[in-house]
């Protein structure tokens, strides 16, 4: 991973220990997840001895397409869910990670029966051909643009999909927030993993009364986290996946608005943790998901108006609010649609197995993690069980008024 781009010590923990934790949780809970579930039937059915159960059955051969930004976590977490649900899977490795992909191509056949798990590599052409195959399920993690291509290809075979995409994720800071705490967490969230995580705060949206203080605390946080020369913090600060990606990020920076950082070195795949202020919705950096360690800071006067502004844009994968005001928290949760998120925290909801993870709208379709993932990757087969010697006579013609009246009781629970 280090030779591809992952370098921070904490990322090694998240990349390795997170999938291991997923395995342990699935092993502990799987028997319970697999059990048929009894469901209530209408009163008339109960009185005649009928019962009903929902059984879970695997969809079948599943294609898991992994992204570059989570070489292990975002490949093996879905794979664990797929396998736990009883589906054989094909792992499509990221072409952006040559060293990691080469290693996995060696290790997967060593430790897995190829009838259960197979790893393949390839670029766009190979993926295009792969998507023509009639898979039983496709699990894709990546960009909205490619997600639409995957969904279009899946539709030709009526293949169900789970799409984990992304978006420009807001981090609100209201006047009641603990400003130093909010600044440090948001700066970390925007720069951890080089900002190359789908759940990273895409921008801070700060009440104007605390904006200047927040900016100063963000500048302090950059130094506290990465020192005065982050480029030397090779163990604590990730590089970017490619020189081209660095150039794209650098083009988004308005140097006149940089209050911290701003430097880049494409050949070293490096860009500073960068704070940009003041930013407006018209700035180019706000047009799309940033996917890098840049933190634009916008200000608002009215919380309702700020939420309405966010709602004009595609639904984000994550949403964050820093506040001590419970009414503001309740309003945020009730008014803004997003995949998942946190209050007074960022990013780490991603690693909690008991919380279904997934997007909404442009940020994704479907959820995984824990029981939610097991359910998403299995078909719910509903079965009504009748005693062998019981007939519901009013079901059969000729239909008298008495039979029609009896049939109407089918809808009473």
Q: Locations of the language-model features?
A:
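N-terminal Rossmann-like NAD(P)+-binding subdomain of aldehyde/semialdehyde dehydrogenases
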Residues: 1-51
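Residue-level signal for inorganic ion chemistry
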Residues: 23, 86, 117, 138, ...
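Rossmann-like NAD(P) dinucleotide-binding subdomain of oxidoreductase/dehydrogenase enzymes
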Residues: 42-181, 300
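Conserved C-terminal structural/oligomerization subdomain of aldehyde/semialdehyde dehydrogenase
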Residues: 270-413
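Short glycine-enriched loop/turn motifs at secondary-structure junctions
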Residues: 132, 165-166, 197-199, 233-234, ...
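Hydrophobic packing residues within well-ordered alpha-helices of enzyme cores
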Residues: 1, 101-104, 108, 130, ...
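Conserved residues at the C-terminal ends of beta-strands
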Residues: 65, 123, 141, 189, ...
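ALDH superfamily catalytic-core signature
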Residues: 112, 146-281, 343, 403-405, ...
